Amino acid sequence: MNISPTPKRYQSSNHMPRAVNHNYHSAVPAYHEHAAGQNADRIVPDEYKINSNMISSLIKQNKDLLAKLDEKDRELEKLNVLVGSLRGKLIKYTELNKKLQAQAQAARVPSPPEPAAEPAADYLQLPRRAPAAENDKKIGELYDKLEQLTKVVHQQHLHDPPAPARPRSPARSRSPARTAVSDDDIMISESSELKRLEEQVDQLKRKVLIKSENELRKLSLNQQLADLMHKLGVSSSSPASSALLFDRQPSPTSAASSAPLAHAHCEQCHHAEDALKKPAMDIKNALQTPTPSRTRRDAHPHTHTTHHATNALW
């Protein structure tokens, strides 16, 4: 019980300047009786608040998961029922299929022949045999006509002479397209043959030209070798020089062409064949500076300058 003479003075926050909380923002006064419960949780630490919030969220998630699990269980029950019905239908249709296959196999197998029915005339109680049907009469007439026609055709075939071979139709024999194609084929074959012959001729010409060039080059190289050997004064009677100069025998085709060249070579070298008969250099002068041996060419007036130039080099 409030014994203050002015109790309302202290119950209002407007008349308590030291009790005013400037950080408090709420529609309910700070010292109101309804606000006492709001300030009561200030003593609870923040960790407990966080834990309680997490626990409440986990409980909610657990409830949701349980609801989903129940829904999945219901779906599984429905699917099991559907699978059972489908299994029953499958068994039913497999049995029906086996039955139909057995019937089809039995239909394919020929049935045993039934015993022939006895004619009605054999029975005494029947006065006479039943008349044949109208269709049977027509079938018999058709068979008779067919036999007559086959006989007539056979007799006509025997009496007629063999037919001559059919001539080719003028449309086919005189067809311009076929003649044009045959002419084109002939022209193509002839042109291909001519081209092949031309290639062979060109190849042979190339071979002959290469052979002649080789022969001429061989002769020119032999001539140059002989000239160089005479300029250096090397004895031509040595086996190396004879092997280089006369390594191959001239072919009969090139003998006639090489005759004038050999004659010119002999005239130019002034009877170079005489140099082959001269003896080699003396053993005493073997270690001395080599000098060209004197030949008939040195006495000739137009080779005097060449001989002096060679001696100057040595």
From Swiss-Prot:
Q: Which residues form a coiled coil?
A: 52-109, 184-215
Entry keyword set: Coiled coil, Cytoplasm, Cytoskeleton, Nucleus
Q: Where is this region: Disordered?
A: 154-186, 288-314
Pfam families assigned to the protein according to its UniProt record, in alphabetical order: Spc42p
- Give a yes or no for keyword Cytoplasm in this entry: yes
Which residues are connected by disulfide bridges in this protein? none
What spans are recorded as compositionally biased (Low complexity)? Answer: 168-178
Q: Which InterPro entries match?
A: Spc42
Query: What superkingdom does the record give?
Result: Eukaryota
Q: GO cellular component terms?
A: cytoplasm; nucleus; spindle pole body
Compartment annotation: Nucleus; Cytoplasm, Cytoskeleton, Microtubule organizing center, Spindle pole body
Q: What this chain does, per the record? A: Forms a polymeric layer at the periphery of the spindle pole body (SPB) central plaque which has an essential function during SPB duplication and may facilitate attachment of the SPB to the nuclear membrane.
Q: Which family does it belong to?
A: Belongs to the SPC42 family.
Q: What is the name of the protein in this document?
A: Spindle pole body component SPC42
Organism (species): Eremothecium gossypii (strain ATCC 10895 / CBS 109.51 / FGSC 9923 / NRRL Y-1056) (Yeast)
Taxon lineage = Eukaryota, Fungi, Dikarya, Ascomycota, Saccharomycotina
State the gene name recorded for this protein: SPC42
